[in-house]
Amino acid sequence: MSAIRYGDNVFITLPRLSTPMIFNGLVPHYTKPNQYEYVPILSSGSIANGDSYIIEPININNSNTALNPQSVFRLKQVSQNKYLYDNNGIVYLGNDTDNKANWSLKPVNLNATTIDYNQEFRLVNQGTGNNAVFSTINNVTMITSKYNDTTNNSIFKFLKGPFTYAQSQCCQGNILYTRPNMCGIYKQGSSVCHTIPSSQSNYPSYTTSMVGSTQSTTPVGSNPPTHRSIDKWYIIGGIFWVIVLIILVIFIIWKLK
């Protein structure tokens, strides 16, 4: 199973909610009539409208190192270059890079020594010691923080990105993306998947029970060579019959003279 690493591009999901959620943008949250901070949007959508984040190391020397429960990192939103940080019980998106923007993963399986994409975990803020928690405040869904929360509302899971990679995994039926379903229209065997190249995966496929299996890889932008060959012969055949028809017409006209 593939380990989660510093530098990975990920989608952030909450898989244990009655309706699983995915981070998919940001919106102003007013703290005073004329003052606001951005908070992440959560929806029951899919990778198609999901918002990806980079697991940014605090120490540059940790780049590409696999995470463990002691690893500390920031979560940087790719589209806006903003960081998730905990402030007064609400998780915001901003430019803060102090310890309130530092996070660690606490696996649901407390015996885990490394963390891979199959695992669920809690996000623990290093500045406050609180867990990130899904909440609804005034009919608005957001991420708050609470010390030692043990509910399903604080259980998270990362899906490896970027979007093109996640898209290919959905089209291959990778169960990490389909259970719960975060694929939307990108379902294995669907018409939208026919033109999407596959990407190498170390995750289990829905169609196999083998963990660590590797899917075949098709280069980006390529089509099966048999299709190209068939199209070529159709064109050559069409040109041949057009030439035959022209010769036949000329012969008939010559005979009628």
From Swiss-Prot:
The keyword Transport does not apply. The keyword Nucleotide-binding does not apply. One of its GO terms (cellular component) is virion component. The chain crosses the membrane at residues 233-253. It is a single-pass membrane protein. This is Uncharacterized protein L778. It is found in: Host membrane; Virion. Glycans are attached at N61, N95, N102, N111, N139, N148, N152. Keywords: Glycoprotein, Host membrane, Membrane, Transmembrane, Transmembrane helix, Virion.
